[in-house]
Amino acid sequence: MGRKVAVLWHASFSIGAGVLYFYFVLPRWPELMGDTGHSLGTGLRIATGALVGLAALPVVFTLLRTRKPELGTPQLALSMRIWSIMAHVLAGALIVGTAISEVWLSLDAAGQWLFGIYGAAAAIAVLGFFGFYLSFVAELPPPPPKPLKPKKPKQRRLRRKKTAKGDEAEPEAAEEAENTELAAQEDEEAVEAPPESIESPGGEPESATREAPAAETATAEEPRGGLRNRRPTGKTSHRRRRTRSGVQVAKVDE
């Protein structure tokens, strides 16, 4: 039996059972209003239970068709069809048994119990109906996995740009530091330039002034890479002392 035939069979039996259930089982308005007799109502209730039970036949045929191992039907779908068959049979049996028991039981004495059983049978039948249709949903293959989102390479590029800028900034800072050091050295050399000579109190200004520039020119001609605090040497020994104001005073050793 194909799927379409099984669905049409099950749907027609389910709709017929639902219509009969509403008019002759619960709430059975025609019988309560006196339009139909009790014997006719009892027969239609038994027919309702039979239709509910027979609605399990298309479920059985579908189970037998899809149970073959070569089809690869999921176990969940098979289990749902088995439970649907059991629900249909149980609901039909409850309706038929309760309808037969009304022959000896009156509604005044056990009406609430009878209606309770009818309601439970209807709930079980609804579960069986939906279980059959949901079994087809369980046969569907799982949805394909969502594709992974590609990682954004822009962040890496930004980081590389930042690192490149940082690398460029480092040599610039080093060059600026070297320039400042060179400027400081030039300032120091400018401060150490030969100041004006001051006459000594001993009465020999000319000899002191002549010897002082000669000694300073000798120190200026020395290479810059040597020691800066090296004192000049000559025929006569001199000692220079720098005051806080930056003026050098030459003293002649007697």
From Swiss-Prot:
The keyword Methyltransferase does not apply. Disruption phenotype: Mutant is unable to utilize both fatty acids and cholesterol during infection in macrophages. Residues 143-254 are annotated as: Disordered. It is found in: Cell membrane. It is a multi-pass membrane protein. One of its GO terms (cellular component) is plasma membrane. Residues 192-220 have a biased composition (Low complexity). Keywords: Cell membrane, Membrane, Transmembrane, Transmembrane helix, Virulence. It comes from the Bacteria. The chain crosses the membrane at residues 5-25, 44-64, 85-105, 114-134. Residues 148-163, 227-244 have a biased composition (Basic residues). Residues 169-191 have a biased composition (Acidic residues). Required for the import of both fatty acids and cholesterol during growth in macrophages and in axenic culture. Facilitates the uptake of these lipids by stabilizing protein subunits of the Mce1 and Mce4 multi-subunit transporters, which transport fatty acids and cholesterol, respectively. Required for full virulence in vivo. Interacts with the Mce1 and Mce4 accessory subunits Rv0199/OmamA, Rv0177/Mam1C and Rv3492c/Mam4B. This is Lipid uptake coordinator A.
